[in-house]
C-alpha cells in the first residue's frame, strides 16, 4: 500500500473537500474564457457530452452546414456544368487560405484536395520514386496508425525497408539524436507527424528536417494534428 503523507490530510477526505471549495468556480472561469464564444459556433446535439475525440473527428461547425447548403442549392443546383468555370480554381484558392492562415506558407504552395491518406500515399510514393538508389524509409512507432499502414504497403510494393524508431515510451517524441542514428546514404524518405496524435508532443521540425536533408533524404510531414493548433512557419 502506498503511504500518503500530508499535514492536513484526513481519512474522511475533508481536507480535499476544503481545498476544492477554495478553487475558482469553473462556471466563472468558463464565462471569462476568451474562447468560450466559439462553442456556439458548433453543432452540439448533446450538451451533457464531453467530447474529447477531436483528433479523430471534430465537431461540425454550423457555418459548414450553411456553406454546403448554399453550394448545393445556389451553385450545383442552379449553375450545373457552368459552375466549373470557378470551381476549377477552388483547390488553389482554399489551399492558399489554409496556407496563409495556418501553415505559414506563401501563395501557390498548398492545394486542398483529396483525403489525408490519399495525399500522404501520393507524396510518399513520389518521394520513394525520386530516390531510386536508396532502399530505406524511416518513420516512428508512435506515428498515426494509418500513416504506418500506408508506409508498410509502399515499402512492400517498392521493395524498400521500413525502419520505425521506437519512441512509444514517455512522450512519444523523436529527438534529433534518435533520428540521426537511423538516417544515412540508404535513406530515401523520412516521415513523421508534426504533433503526435496521442501524446501531443511537438517535434522540432526544422532540426529534424536538417538532419534528414543532410543525409540526402526527402521528408514528408503529416500536419493533420498540428494545423490550427500550433504556430507553423513552413516557409
Can you describe what each PLM-predicted range is?
Residues 2-235:
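Pyridoxal 5′-phosphate
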Amino acid at each position: 500500500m502506498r503511504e500518503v503523507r500530508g499535514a492536513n490530510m484526513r481519512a474522511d477526505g475533508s481536507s480535499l473537500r476544503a481545498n476544492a471549495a477554495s478553487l475558482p468556480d469553473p462556471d466563472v472561469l468558463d464565462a471569462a474564457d476568451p474562447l468560450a464564444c466559439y462553442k456556439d459556433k458548433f453543432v452540439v446535439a448533446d450538451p451533457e457530452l464531453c467530447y474529447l475525440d477531436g483528433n479523430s473527428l471534430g465537431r461540425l461547425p454550423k457555418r459548414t452546414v450553411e456553406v454546403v447548403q448554399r453550394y448545393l442549392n445556389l451553385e450545383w443546383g442552379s449553375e450545373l456544368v457552368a459552375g466549373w468555370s470557378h470551381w476549377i480554381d477552388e483547390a488553389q484558392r482554399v489551399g492558399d487560405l489554409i496556407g496563409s492562415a495556418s501553415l505559414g506558407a506563401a501563395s501557390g504552395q498548398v492545394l486542398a484536395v483529396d483525403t489525408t491518406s490519399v495525399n500522404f500515399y501520393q507524396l510518399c510514393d513520389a518521394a520513394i520514386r525520386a530516390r531510386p538508389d536508396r532502399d530505406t524509409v524511416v518513420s516512428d512507432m508512435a506515428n498515426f496508425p494509418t500513416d504506418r499502414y500506408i508506409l508498410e504497403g509502399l515499402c512492400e510494393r517498392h521493395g524498400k525497408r521500413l525502419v520505425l524508431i521506437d519512441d512509444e515510451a514517455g512522450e512519444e517524441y523523436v529527438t534529433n539524436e534518435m533520428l540521426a542514428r537511423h538516417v544515412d546514404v540508404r535513406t530515401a524518405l523520412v516521415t513523421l507527424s508534426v504533433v503526435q496524435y496521442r501524446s501531443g508532443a511537438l517535434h522540432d521540425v526544422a532540426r529534424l528536417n536538417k538532419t534528414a536533408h543532410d543525409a540526402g533524404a526527402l521528408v514528408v510531414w503529416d500536419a493533420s494534428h498540428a494545423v490550427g493548433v500550433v504556430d507553423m512557419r513552413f516557409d
